[in-house]
Regions:
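Alpha/beta hydrolase fold serine-hydrolase catalytic domain that processes acyl esters and thioesters
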Residues: 1-43, 61-247
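Gly/Ala-rich beta-loop-alpha elbow adjacent to hydrolase catalytic centers
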Residues: 48-52, 56
Length: 247
C-alpha cells in the first residue's frame, strides 16, 4: 500500500485499493436501498482526488461489469443474444456522476471495455493546467482544465486550484506546453518498452521516490525542497532508460 501501490497502478489492474473502492461503493448501493422512495432508490455520486479518482472510476466500472454479467445471464436463460453496446441496465444506473480530480486513467484494454464505455459519459475529469498525474494512462474523457497558482507537479495539490467568486473552478483553455511535453514523453516511453521493462522501471522509480522519506505524493510535494535533492541523488543509481524518463 502507499507509494508501491501508486506506482503499480501504472502496470497492474486491479490493485488492492481499487478492489476496496469497488467493495465500498457496492456496499453504499446496498445500504441506500433502505431509503427507497415511492418509485426508485436514490442516486449517488462517487469521486476522489489523485489515486482516489482512479479508484472511483474503477469502482463504477466493476459495478457496471456485474450488471453486464447479470444481464447476459438473463439473456442466456431466455435464449436471447447478449447486448454488445450501449447503456447497461442495473444498479450502475444509480451512479449519476463519477468525479476524478487529477486522477490517472486506465490501460487501453480497460477504457475500451464495455463497462468503461457505459459509464464514460458520467465521468467528470478535472485536472490543473500543468497536470502530470491526471494525464497518465488513458481515459478518452476530455478533462476540464483548472488554473492553479503553483508550478508543474506542485499543481497536483488541490489547494492550489483557483476558484471563482461563484464557487466554480476557474477554467484554463488547455494544458501548458510543459505538461503536454511531459505527457507525450511518458506515453511514448510506455509505447516503446515491453511490460517487463515497464515493471522494472516502475520498481526503480518507486525506490527513488521512497528514498525521499515521504509516504505519499501529497507529503512529497508539500516538502519538495527537502525531497527533490534526495530524489535526484537516488536517480543517479538507476539505468539510463529510467533516468531519461525521470528527466
Amino acid at each position: 500500500v502507499g507509494w508501491k501501490e501508486d506506482f503499480n497502478m501504472a502496470v497492474r489492474c486491479p490493485v488492492p485499493s481499487q478492489e476496496s473502492a469497488y467493495r465500498y461503493a457496492d456496499s453504499i448501493l446496498d445500504r441506500t436501498e433502505r431509503f427507497l422512495s415511492a418509485k426508485k432508490s436514490p442516486d449517488i455520486m462517487i469521486g476522489g482526488h489523485s489515486k482516489g479518482g482512479n479508484m472511483a472510476v474503477y469502482a463504477a466500472m466493476q459495478i457496471t461489469q456485474s450488471d453486464i454479467e447479470a444481464t447476459n445471464e438473463r439473456a442466456q436463460r431466455l435464449g436471447l443474444l447478449p447486448a454488445l453496446g450501449g447503456s447497461v441496465p442495473g444498479r450502475n444506473c444509480r451512479i449519476s456522476r463519477i468525479f476524478s480530480h487529477d486522477g490517472p486513467g486506465m490501460s487501453q484494454v480497460m477504457v475500451h471495455s464495455r463497462a468503461y464505455q457505459a459509464i464514460a459519459a458520467r465521468i467528470d475529469k478535472t485536472v490543473p493546467e500543468s497536470s502530470i498525474i491526471g494525464m497518465l494512462l488513458q481515459s478518452q474523457i476530455k478533462p476540464t482544465f483548472v488554473k492553479a497558482d503553483a508550478i508543474s507537479i506542485l499543481q497536483h495539490m488541490g489547494s492550489s486550484w483557483q476558484v471563482t467568486q461563484s464557487g466554480e473552478f476557474e477554467q484554463a483553455s488547455e494544458l501548458t506546453g510543459g505538461a503536454q511535453l511531459i505527457g507525450k514523453t511518458i506515453d511514448g516511453w510506455f509505447d516503446r518498452v515491453s511490460q517487463e521493462q515497464r515493471e522494472r522501471a516502475i520498481n526503480q522509480i518507486y525506490d527513488i521516490f521512497a528514498a525521499a522519506g515521504y509516504g505519499n505524493i501529497a507529503d512529497l510535494v508539500a516538502h519538495w525542497t527537502d525531497s527533490l535533492p534526495k530524489i535526484v541523488a537516488a536517480a543517479r543509481g538507476t539505468d539510463v532508460q529510467t533516468r531519461e524518463l525521470i528527466k
